Regions:
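Active-site-adjacent alpha-helix immediately C-terminal to a catalytic or transition-state-stabilizing loop
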Residues: 104-122
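Cysteine-based protein phosphatase catalytic domain of the PTP/DSP
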Residues: 2-98, 119-122
Length: 122
């Protein structure tokens, strides 16, 4: 887990499970479908039902859970997912809350969202 700017951390699933999940004072962006989006919605099929109101993302307290898979083609990623994640990060940081953005391995989805946040901030 690394801090890329003050109070914004990028990591992997293990960082969340072993370091953040049991602490208070954190907001978390789960930038991975498995297992968090599946657990939040409770679906047993390969993917979430497309007509579910939380198909793209679910918010549970200080956790934003994205239906985000690791794909090579960015056209498969809904801009609404990215926009919501960036706003969630901004809102959390503005309220003095530390934020962890994580994916399964911490090598693509989470760092990409962190870089997009930094690029948008200028």
């Amino acid at each position: 887990m690394i801090e890329i700017i003050p109070n914004l951390f990028i990591g992997d699933q293990n960082d969340y499970e072993s370091r953040v999940s049991r602490q208070t004072g954190w907001a978390v962006v789960h930038a991975c479908k498995e297992p968090y989006h599946r657990q939040a919605l409770g679906y047993k099929t390969r993917g979430a039902p497309r007509n579910h109101p939380e198909y793209l993302m679910a918010k549970r307290g200080d956790r934003l859970i994205l239906n985000l898979v690791d794909v090579d083609d960015p056209s498969f990623i809904a801009s609404e997912i990215v926009d919501t994640a960036l706003q969630f990060i901004e809102d959390s940081l503005s309220n003095g809350i530390k934020v962890l953005v994580h994916c399964n391995q911490g090598e693509s989805r989470a760092p990409s969202i962190g870089l997009l946040y930094m690029a948008n901030k200028g």
